[in-house]
């Protein structure tokens, strides 16, 4: 059984040892249900399509491992960006499609994703590919900040 020390994450805010934020989060007062309802439209406005979603509360309930939190992860993709990145570096596929997590914490809605700038900075890649990854990540940030 896996045990996670929640206070570790509260204190460290998902930072790496070098101080880079690995998980980018945005908090909004917009209700969770509204964010989930509008996420597809906001993604399309930024050139991303939603490929699928995973409602962990429902999935884990059916497996006999219920959780109290409503956590949904959306897989989003910009096909032309994915093509360019994958043609440059196949291994980056482990981070694709991009994922946006939506859940409620302390009465507010939280949107979270992997900080692709941190990922790009940690890879030995050329500046053109790094710049392209940064650009895609900025679109994800814009989607996540749509409710603020």
Model segments located where?
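Charged, well-structured alpha/beta interaction segments
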Residues: 41-59
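Terminal, regulation- and interaction-focused segments at domain boundaries
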Residues: 18-46
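Compact, glycine-rich, soluble single-domain proteins
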Residues: 55-98
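Well-ordered alpha/beta subsegment
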Residues: 122-148
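Short, Lys/Arg-enriched N-terminal segments with co-localized hydrophobic residues
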Residues: 2-21
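Beta-strand/loop substructures that line and gate deep hydrophobic ligand-binding cavities in soluble
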Residues: 99-126
């Amino acid at each position: 059984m896996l045990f996670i020390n929640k206070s570790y994450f509260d204190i460290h805010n998902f930072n790496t040892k070098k101080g880079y934020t690995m998980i980018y989060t945005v908090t909004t007062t917009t209700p969770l249900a509204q964010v989930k309802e509008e996420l597809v439209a906001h993604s399309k406005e930024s050139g991303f399509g939603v490929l699928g979603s995973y409602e962990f509360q429902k999935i884990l309930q059916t497996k006999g491992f219920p959780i109290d939190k409503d956590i949904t992860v959306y897989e989003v993709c910009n096909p032309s960006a994915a093509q360019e990145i994958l043609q440059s570096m196949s291994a980056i596929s482990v981070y694709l499609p991009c994922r946006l997590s939506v859940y409620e914490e302390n009465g507010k809605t939280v949107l979270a994703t992997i900080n692709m700038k941190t990922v790009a900075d940690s890879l030995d890649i050329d500046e053109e590919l790094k710049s392209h990854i940064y650009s895609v990540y900025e679109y994800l940030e814009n989607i996540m900040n749509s409710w603020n």
